[in-house]
Amino acid sequence: MSLAVEYISDKTPCQRCSTKDAVLLARRENYCGDCFIRFIRGKQRRSMQDEAYKVKYKTVENPHRVLLALSGGSSSLVLLDAVASLLQEQAGQHGGRQGFALTVVNVDERERLKLDKSFQDIISELKSRYLPVDIDFVSLDYDMYVDGRLLHHIKVASDFSSYSIPLNKGTNINDILKGCNSKSSEEDLLSIILNELLLKTAITHQCGTLLYGHSMTRLADEVLALTIKGRGSTIHSSVLDHTEEISGQTINVKYPLRDVLMGEIEAYCKLAKLDSVVMSSTIPDPVINKNKTVRGLTAQYFRQLDATGYSSTASTVVRTAAKLAAPTVGTKSGTCKVCGVEIRQDPHQWLRRITVAENEKVENNSEESGEIGADKKEDVGEQIDLCYGCTVTIGDAPSFRWPLSDKDIIAEYTLDSDED
């Protein structure tokens, strides 16, 4: 039992270089600051050893472009620092050439999370820190996901069948979230929107790779949260490098920091002096557990494990989840119209089997009894496919709206990029 990182105050030599004093103990080894930073960067570089990321001396018409998702949190900033340092080394060793082009994208959450700084506030510092590397910075908004032409009202009936009715009026993301029954449902839907926005941005900017800065602790948190929310079929793609096929294009999705614990991320931030650009929420964590979201509870669980010396639990969770594969049971019967996941087993049939229906009233005339428990299809709309997770998330929300479209169709929207 040990903490992920323990700082050293006495004079102890670094076990890597033997020339400097160690500043911390991690994974049973003493590191000086430079060696620890090099150790963490090595994790990222091992995950990006393909030829696509190496320097080419021949003229390439369309150089490989990488999209890096930057939330402004410590993990994504550590990933940016590691990737940018790789590009700096390539430029220094190969006459200014880079192995790939880098685009950094941020989805604006300053208002929702009450962040202490905005993405625009840190761009200039990031640019100066990573000179002479040329990095494109792109800012997105959740409302870019909402296409009024595709907007539908979605209703889950008492028998768990799902229906949609086209809407003529526009809406924004805040209106959509108001239709949720809980903070956990809001959080779940925002994660769907975020992933779709990033994939669409990768296509728009002709990026062949999408990088997430999730640490091992964050991925373990995600595994538990997905299980609780009934989205177990997506666990394999949430912890492992994989590909996404969209509009005939292939996007390589990678998690370069999947072997790095959160305690190690925080130590890297401190040693690399990244704390000044970390975007932190000013909203205090709810004290009462019932006011926390599912992800808030799972994150709290792993923070407590880290604090009590059981940080290796996250490694066990992620390694176990990595053994999972894409669902193969049954044949594909449809695609969820909200999250885009393949449906192989009817979730509505399962929900009907485990749910006890309310008792019907005995005193009814024939006309009333014919309407009990039955939804009039002409009032409900067209039947659509929803996965188990989305059926539970939407639940009995009285007024839930969502833009329905096939996952591989890219809606038109505008991206704000920093070209300076």
Curated annotation (Swiss-Prot):
The keyword Nucleotide-binding does not apply. GO terms for biological process: protein urmylation; tRNA thio-modification; tRNA wobble position uridine thiolation; tRNA wobble uridine modification. It is found in: Cytoplasm. GO terms for cellular component: cytosol. GO terms for molecular function: nucleotidyltransferase activity; sulfurtransferase activity; tRNA binding. PANTHER family: CYTOPLASMIC TRNA 2-THIOLATION PROTEIN 2. This is Cytoplasmic tRNA 2-thiolation protein 2. It comes from Meyerozyma guilliermondii (strain ATCC 6260 / CBS 566 / DSM 6381 / JCM 1539 / NBRC 10279 / NRRL Y-324) (Yeast). The gene is NCS2.
